[in-house]
């Protein structure tokens, strides 16, 4: 997974 730190700072697998 990738940490979407630019979308809130939560780990989001995309």
Swiss-Prot record:
Its cofactor is Ca(2+). Ca(2+) binds at residues 7, 10, 12. GO terms for molecular function: alpha-amylase activity; metal ion binding. Keywords: Calcium, Carbohydrate metabolism, Glycosidase, Hydrolase, Metal-binding. Belongs to the glycosyl hydrolase 13 family. Binds 3 Ca(2+) ions per subunit. Monomer. It catalyses: Endohydrolysis of (1->4)-alpha-D-glucosidic linkages in polysaccharides containing three or more (1->4)-alpha-linked D-glucose units. This is Alpha-amylase 1. The keyword Coiled coil does not apply. The keyword Protein biosynthesis does not apply. Its EC number is 3.2.1.1. It is an enzyme of class 3 (hydrolase).
């Amino acid at each position: 997974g990738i940490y979407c730190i630019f979308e809130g700072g939560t780990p989001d697998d995309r």
